[in-house]
Amino acid sequence: MRIRRKKWVEDELKNSVLYIDRTEDTKNKWKNIFDIDNNGNKNDFEIHIEIGMGKGKFVSSLFKEYANNKRYSNTYIIGIDMIEAMLGLAKREIENRILDISKEERESIIKKRDGSYTNIELKEKVENINNIDNFKKIRILNANAENIDKYFGKEDNVTRIYLNFSNPWPKDKHKKRRLTHMTKLKKYLEFLSGKKEIYFKTDDYNFFEESREYFKEIGFKEEIITHNLQNDDIYLKKAGIKNIITEHEKMFLDKGIFINAGIFVYNNK
């Protein structure tokens, strides 16, 4: 997705506890990054990641969903993208969710000619957001999926990956770029732990069917699949969380396009 450079992004990311730069050494260190205290129990936490999070609608909604679900009380979330402007938008989206404010309210904070600001109370809330406890369970990472295994290891307890509406790369010469391609799946298995789940959604039927073959070839089992996500109650129940409709998904649904989805679990027996 093409997106214009935004002047405010660099400073906002640099000063946010949410943001982890691609230059940081994170492999097998996410427990320390999240400051997880599990009383010496090595595996008493899980990390779920979304690769290609875009503007952050999914991870911010997932964060709120997990916060209200005891099943995910020890689960931490990382949204990943390689485009700095996207990371900036995702940062604001997450902050807005935590503060329970709209994008429009956030944008109402305007610096006036005399140097003062409109909506001072909200401005102070935003400035102090790094001190909110909720921030302890979510991060955004600037990273390229091509070397995703550089940022995660087995000690990080990454048990689930979300892949939502990633580029289908339909031309044969580009298919290795797919986030579901076998080369990527092998990289994910370098660090996936526990159940080793991948939740995959796309509007592209051919991309979905070819991806099913990739998963099968590497040794993943299909826990459940659907070609009509919105109307498949069995799938939604199996997923364990409500379906979070992103901007892409809404656009496709408005056009009458069915959503394909699958939960794939690695069979290492």
Please describe what each predicted stretch is.
Residues 211-213, 218-269:
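Class I S-adenosyl-L-methionine
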Residues 180-194:
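A short glycine-rich, Lys/Arg-flanked "PGG" loop and its adjoining helix->strand segment in the class I
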Residues 195-202:
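Conserved beta-strand signature within the Rossmann-like core of class I S-adenosyl-L-methionine
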Residues 1-49, 57-65, 94-154:
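S-adenosyl-L-methionine
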Residues 54:
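Conserved glycine-rich SAM-binding loop
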Residues 90:
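Conserved SAM-binding loop
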Residues 83:
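Conserved SAM/SAH-binding beta-strand->alpha-helix loop
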